[in-house]
Swiss-Prot record:
It comes from Bos taurus. It is found in: Nucleus; Chromosome. This is Histone H1.3. The modification Phosphoserine is found at residues 2, 105. H1 histones are progressively phosphorylated during the cell cycle, becoming maximally phosphorylated during late G2 phase and M phase, and being dephosphorylated sharply thereafter.
Length: 221
């Protein structure tokens, strides 16, 4: 019995540790949401400087007043404001007209503002070639239609074969002419055979004389 008693309190100990981890995760997520909810300091500074109408630029004190009016905690984020000003000056978005570092007056760089606006137009122009590329893809479908044309060109080759057969027919006709030339020689021989026929006709002429002699004999009787 004494051995089973100390085991019971050891079981709830891990159950107490698990909710602590969950709370830590929830608190970390909440802190991340709080940081992500507000805009960055650099954007607030640029908006405040752009809203001012002072030609000489906005001083650090005037900038802090503008940020405080926008609901930004200037006292807690004083170091962030100074770092944001230095980074904006180094990037070229702000121009420091007076002073050095974070102290002094700051003015919005118009060239940088126009330079930022131009790349947006370039991006829009770059989007148009994509549409043109899509239109260029459409003619690829017509290439599929062009393949039947190649097949149509191949079909006349079959028609050329009968032409070759016609050539063979012409060659076959030429021997016929040669055969027709051979019978011309035998035609001369019948002409020679006709020549003796008139000679044989002379004895036939003598037959009537015999008939006349027979008639004369009959008269004498």
């Amino acid at each position: 019995m004494s051995e089973t008693a100390p085991v019971a309190p050891a079981a709830p100990a891990p159950a107490e540790k698990t909710p602590v981890k969950k709370k830590a995760k929830k608190s970390g997520v909440a802190a991340g949401k709080r940081k992500a909810s507000g805009p960055p300091v650099s954007e607030l500074i640029t908006k405040a400087v752009a809203a001012s109408k002072e030609r000489s630029g906005v001083s650090l004190a005037a900038l802090k007043k503008a940020l405080a009016a926008a609901g930004y905690d200037v006292e807690k984020n004083n170091s962030r404001i100074k770092l944001g000003l230095k980074s904006l000056v180094s990037k070229g978005t702000l121009v420091q007209t007076k002073g050095t570092g974070a102290s002094g007056s700051f003015k919005l760089n118009k060239k940088a503002a126009t330079g930022e606006a131009k790349p947006k137009g370039k991006k829009a122009g770059a989007a148009k070639p994509k549409k043109a590329a899509g239109a260029a893809k459409k003619p690829k479908k017509s290439t599929g239609a062009a393949t039947p044309k190649k097949a149509a060109k191949k079909t006349p080759k079959k028609v050329k074969k009968p032409a070759a057969a016609a050539g063979t027919k012409k060659v076959a006709k030429s021997p016929k002419k040669a055969k027709a030339a051979k019978p011309k020689k035998p035609t001369k021989s019948p002409a020679k055979a006709k020549a003796p026929k008139p000679k044989a006709a002379k004895p036939k002429a003598a037959k009537p004389k015999a008939t006349k002699a027979k008639k004369a004999v009959s008269k004498k009787k």
